[in-house]
Amino acid sequence: MILESAAVIYRGFPKRLHHAVPHWVETRALFHIRMTLDCEKKQRALTQPNLAQALLDSAKFFENKQRWHITLFLLMPDHLHALLSFARDQSMSGIIGDWKRFHARKNRVVWQEGYFDHRLRADERGEQLSAKLNYIRHNPVAAGLCDKPEDWTWIIDPFG
């Protein structure tokens, strides 16, 4: 094992990534976030209607409380995609941890540890943002869950 500043490396792969946003990242930077269910546990699908509505309602609640800003938030049966931005004085990992813990307690959702995040750089936002939006919106179609992106129910898409 080799210790590096951003991750512990095991067999060439990060064992754990740290999600601290560097101080030089612009305010309201946009992040592609992916959270996944723990597949080893028996799970209710995130798209089960009561759970899906609770997840979407709490995502909107977090936005109303200015914990994050939603550009896109889409539920799949075993994971979710979100394009979110956070105020500079907010901890991205803290906010996501709070949201996941809330659903772990209230709805017995068992999440995989951590989450994936990728910052969309300001100079790439136009093309890269369009590609990310398209990819996420078409995820249910690619999985055979609906015929067209606009048929998918479990989404918050303020710009779509």
Predicted regions and their residues:
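Short catalytic/metal-binding and nucleic-acid-binding patches
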Residues: 1-160
